[in-house]
């Protein structure tokens, strides 16, 4: 499956906000001008962005935050739309409960990309069973852990240490000494940090 492998800072500049693709703990704001588009001098335009353009940009931003490609993102939206409740919130909950995102939220990876790599390299177990599919949906009560052979990896130890300092999300409980965590419940919308306006995505797919 094709994925963007270019400079991560360029994606954040394109969206005009830090997507935290390089690190969840270190902001890019001090390193580059997030309000300047990629290009030699930053692309500028006096034209007003259309409603469609604004909606499309929001969708692209969320796809980049979670590392999801278009076809998969459409499937998530279709599932979110089928479920009861608010479609936008359902969409974010589906994305937040992806295994790679849960590994990231528990602090085992410093970025979602790093967490995805840990899953793909079979360094993660779910309820004691080795998991290697980043998109696997984690359910309330599931226990996610680092395999014994991977516990000494410096990047995992460092990421977990930084996550502990910054604080864990309320919907996960992590035992750093055991390198494992429990997905307690689906996060509420207010619990999901990030500059995301999911209603724009719902409007886009409702056109």
Curated annotation (Swiss-Prot):
Pfam families: Ribosomal_S4 (PF00163), S4 (PF01479). Residues 31-55 are annotated as: Disordered. Residues 97-160 form the S4 RNA-binding domain. One of its GO terms (biological process) is ribosomal small subunit biogenesis. Residues 42-53 have a biased composition (Polar residues). It comes from the Bacteria. The keyword RNA-binding applies. The keyword RNA-binding applies. GO terms for molecular function: rRNA binding; structural constituent of ribosome. PROSITE patterns: RIBOSOMAL_S4, S4. One of its GO terms (cellular component) is small ribosomal subunit. InterPro entries: Ribosomal_uS4 (IPR022801), Ribosomal_uS4_bac-type (IPR005709), Ribosomal_uS4_CS (IPR018079), Ribosomal_uS4_N (IPR001912), S4_RNA-bd (IPR002942), S4_RNA-bd_sf (IPR036986). Keywords: Ribonucleoprotein, Ribosomal protein, RNA-binding, rRNA-binding. Part of the 30S ribosomal subunit. Contacts protein S5. The interaction surface between S4 and S5 is involved in control of translational fidelity. One of the primary rRNA binding proteins, it binds directly to 16S rRNA where it nucleates assembly of the body of the 30S subunit. With S5 and S12 plays an important role in translational accuracy. Belongs to the universal ribosomal protein uS4 family. This is Small ribosomal subunit protein uS4. It comes from Burkholderia ambifaria (strain MC40-6).
């Amino acid at each position: 499956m094709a994925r963007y492998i270019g400079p991560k800072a360029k994606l954040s500049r394109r969206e005009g906000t830090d997507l935290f693709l390089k690190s969840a703990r270190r902001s890019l704001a001090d390193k580059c001008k997030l309000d300047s588009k990629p290009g030699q001098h930053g692309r500028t335009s006096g034209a007003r962005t259309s409603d469609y353009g604004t909606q499309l940009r929001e969708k692209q931003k969320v796809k980049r935050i979670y590392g999801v490609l278009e076809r998969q993102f459409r499937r998530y939206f279709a599932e979110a739309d089928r479920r009861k409740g608010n479609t936008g919130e359902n969409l974010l909950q589906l994305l937040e409960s992806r295994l790679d995102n849960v590994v990231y939220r528990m602090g085992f990876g410093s970025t979602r990309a790093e967490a995805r790599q840990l899953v793909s390299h079979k360094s993660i177990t779910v309820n004691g069973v080795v998991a290697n599919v980043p998109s696997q949906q984690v359910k309330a009560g599931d226990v996610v852990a680092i395999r014994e052979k991977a516990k000494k990896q410096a990047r995992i130890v460092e990421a977990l240490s930084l996550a502990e300092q910054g604080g864990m999300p309320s919907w996960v409980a992590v035992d750093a000494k055991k390198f494992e965590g429990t997905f307690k419940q689906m996060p509420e919308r207010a619990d999901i940090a990030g500059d995301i306006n999911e209603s724009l995505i719902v409007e886009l797919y409702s056109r």
